[in-house]
Swiss-Prot record:
Cofactor binding note of this UniProt entry: Binds 2 heme b groups non-covalently with two histidine residues as axial ligands. Binds one heme group covalently by a single cysteine link with no axial amino acid ligand. This heme was named heme ci.
Membrane-spanning intervals of the chain: 32-52, 90-110, 116-136, 186-206
Binding-site residues, heme b 2: H86, H187
Protein family per UniProt: Belongs to the cytochrome b family. PetB subfamily.
Required cofactor(s): heme b; heme c
An MF annotation (GO) of this entry: electron transporter, transferring electrons within cytochrome b6/f complex of photosystem II activity
Protein known as: Cytochrome b6
Subcellular location: Plastid, Chloroplast thylakoid membrane
Species for this entry: Solanum lycopersicum (Tomato)
């Protein structure tokens, strides 16, 4: 076994990477509130795992979406548990994200030289809220339908470009299959991809700059 490890160590310098990960200095003022970002990440990973599991059963059509969610909850093995964990972790992710933003703001973590870390964090906060908006519609029940109708109708108040924006969001003049398809694509592909990209920008900057000092 040691020969296998030595072979990889010679080529990848695993020990140096491990030392870099485990030897970062942690300031004495750090407390549990500095873990909120990590908890948010954990919730996101739970979302990815449970959401991926539900894609095997969910059908993104206006005629079958609600029935497929019912099937997940009543007939699919552990489907009720997977969807419940998905829903609970979604709520937890939003809550932890809000608390994390407040913690960073109140402790001055957005100040020089961490401006870019703050900007990427704000983008991640917007993406998190977008997950909630798009995911809420996917069961295509009465609550989801009317929530989508209200949310997508908000831009209509914008002069000149309002109506085109509404049609872009809905995929047509009214809420229907095109709207559900758009929201499903956003929720399961576009938003997770963008979130992963901005996380890959956010975390290395934290590693590079370290944790901000006390006020």
């Amino acid at each position: 076994m040691s020969k296998v490890y030595d072979w990889f160590e010679e080529r990848l310098e695993i020990q140096a990477i491990a030392d870099d990960i485990t030897s970062k200095y942690v300031p004495p003022h750090v407390n549990i509130f500095y873990c909120l970002g990590g908890i948010t990440l954990t919730c996101f990973l739970v979302q990815v795992a449970t959401g991926f599991a539900m894609t095997f059963y969910y059908r993104p059509t206006v005629t079958e979406a609600f029935a497929s969610v019912q099937y997940i909850m009543t007939e699919a093995n552990f489907g009720w548990l997977i969807r419940s964990v998905h829903r609970w972790s979604a709520s937890m992710m939003v809550l932890m994200m809000i608390l994390h933003v407040f913690r960073v703001y109140l402790t001055g973590g957005f100040k020089k030289p961490r401006e870019l870390t703050w900007v990427t964090g704000v983008v991640l906060a917007v993406l998190t809220a977008s997950f909630g908006v798009t995911g809420y519609s996917l069961p295509w029940d009465q609550i989801g339908y009317w929530a989508v109708k209200i949310v997508t109708g908000v831009p209509d108040a914008i002069p000149v470009i309002g109506s085109p924006l509404v049609e872009l969001l809905r995929g047509s003049a009214s809420v229907g299959q095109s709207t559900l398809t758009r929201f499903y694509s956003l929720h399961t592909f576009v938003l997770p991809l963008l979130t992963a990209v901005f996380m890959l920008m956010h975390f290395p900057m934290i590693r590079k700059q370290g944790i901000s000092g006390p006020l």
